[in-house]
Swiss-Prot record:
Primary location group: secreted
Taxonomic source organism: Crotalus durissus collilineatus
Protein name: Thrombin-like enzyme collinein-4
EC number: 3.4.21.-
Source taxon at top rank: Eukaryota
């Protein structure tokens, strides 16, 4: 776990936006935890990448 942040979905101007914006509170994860959990992404040992979400799966801005 870690700190929590609020994300909002941004879509292409060509897409129709819903009446209610999609947003979710997600957890910011330690980068090394994310890197270990997702070796298929071949993340570098150090990065300025933000890793956020729930390792077990859950809501994100694409959740319907």
């Amino acid at each position: 776990g870690g700190d929590e942040c609020n994300i909002n979905e941004h879509r292409s101007p060509q897409e129709t936006l819903p009446d209610v914006p999609h947003c979710a509170n997600i957890n910011l994860l330690d980068y090394e935890v994310c890197r270990t959990a997702h070796p298929q992404f071949r993340l570098p040992a150090t990065s300025r990448t933000l890793c956020a979400g729930i390792l077990e799966g859950g809501k994100d801005t694409c959740h319907r």
